[in-house]
Amino acid sequence: MHLEKIDRDGRGRFAFLAYDQGLEHGPEDFRPNPEAASPRFVLELARDSDYTAVVFQQGVALATRELYPEVPRLVKLNGKAGLAKGEPYSPLLCPVEYAVKALRAVAVGYTIYLGSEHEARMLAEFAQVVRDAEALGVPTVAWVYPRGKAVGSDTAPEIVAYAARVAYELGADVAKVKWSGSVDSFRWACTSAVTTKVVLSGGVLTESPGEFLAVVDGVMRAGGAGVAVGRNVWQRPRAEAGAISKDIVARVRA
């Protein structure tokens, strides 16, 4: 494990600002706050609120390589567009070496759609990502999202715990999973992940900042390692986005 690249104080707490949604969700995600269509907005939030890293796809990381270079980048290695339906598969688009050496990534991430009929390909691709990242000394973050016709509720406690365990079994340093609905059930997900750190997948915009912050509090009480939040920050106007960012980071690092 190479968490020292992103673990600033040695406590294993992480607040990632996710901005990889533009590929899969399209520009509609930016409509609530058009300023967020520019990665400059997100980089400024990350800088001002001291997020652990900002999450970019390859192209955004390349386009902004010289913009606020002091903000650490976590490069998302795979992705897909959101127009085609059916069983999801998110192919590897960016090699680990390119992310680290050309894009200056301090960590790399990969999505696995657990339960998809294409699951085996994604498991194999991520296993290789872990080996490549290990060779270069950078941590890996596994987005583990149960999805597909074989999956019922993707937030059922046993499904979330399974997702966390898969990340551990494959060698991920950090697992990004959905909220399972309660502190006790999320605690079991964290226990199931053993030494892999578990962070919350932020999800869709909540009606109020307080609603999302209550979930963050639950994650931390359950033994979670933090959050990877996107829409619940940058879909809000700048002042509100900055305020909730500071609240998120403070809770994670408390």
Language-model region placement:
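N-terminal basic/disordered segments at the start of proteins
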Residues: 1-11, 15
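Surface-exposed loop/turn and secondary-structure junction residues enriched for glycine/proline
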Residues: 6-9, 26, 148, 236-237
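Alpha/beta enzyme core
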Residues: 14, 18-54, 59-81, 88-198, ...
